[in-house]
């Protein structure tokens, strides 16, 4: 159910685009994200900061798309969101000496500091790359191709990256009885 709630706005955006075009799809995405946040707030009592950020970005860039009647703004939305997330990880690591990936996942998994650092850098690089890739598709292909990439390509690449991260983590996770990860044992 959580996955459906997470993908609710993008699924509706995609469907609306196929039927009515980019401007109606943009309005639908804004409304769906507002409904999504309202549902999460009612159901769980708390909305995560990333969800608020996503709402702010869709309202800002979607609103600009509708007001200016220019699809350029909505095409920039994923890039801005990716770069904000990657930038947050980067600033956290370099400026505040805080690994936000470890802060998010540290209670669920026990890893050595270098592995946490590699995860943080990996996600930072992934978000930066996805932002550039989104712009490349947006400016080199038609809007229909960009929408398909946004749904299928973006989610597919995210899924592949998560699997790669899981494989990387599986080499370093401590077993219940182990004192150290497999690759760090003498």
UniProtKB/Swiss-Prot annotation:
It comes from the Bacteria. Plays a role in cell envelope biogenesis, maintenance of cell envelope integrity and membrane homeostasis. Signal peptide: none annotated. GO terms for cellular component: plasma membrane. The chain crosses the membrane at residues 10-30, 47-67, 76-96, 121-141, 149-169. Keywords: Cell inner membrane, Cell membrane, Membrane, Transmembrane, Transmembrane helix. This is Inner membrane-spanning protein YciB. It is found in: Cell inner membrane. Belongs to the YciB family. It is a multi-pass membrane protein.
């Amino acid at each position: 159910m959580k996955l459906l709630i997470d993908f609710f706005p993008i699924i509706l955006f995609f469907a609306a685009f196929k039927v009515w075009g980019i401007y109606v799809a943009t309005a639908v995405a804004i409304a769906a994200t507002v409904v999504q946040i309202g549902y999460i707030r009612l159901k769980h009592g708390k909305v995560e900061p990333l969800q608020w950020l996503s709402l702010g970005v869709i309202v800002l860039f979607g609103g600009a798309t509708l007001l200016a009647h220019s699809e350029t703004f909505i095409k920039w939305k994923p890039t801005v969101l990716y770069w904000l997330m990657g930038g947050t990880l980067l600033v956290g690591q370099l400026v505040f000496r805080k690994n936000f990936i470890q802060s998010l996942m540290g209670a669920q998994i026990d890893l050595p500091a270098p592995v946490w650092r590699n995860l943080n850098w990996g996600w930072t690089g992934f978000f930066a790359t996805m932002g550039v890739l989104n712009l490349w598709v947006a400016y080199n292909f038609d809007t229909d191709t960009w929408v398909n990439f946004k749904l299928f390509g973006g989610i597919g690449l995210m899924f592949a990256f998560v699997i790669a991260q899981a494989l990387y983590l599986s080499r370093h996770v401590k077993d219940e009885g182990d004192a150290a990860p497999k690759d760090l044992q003498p």
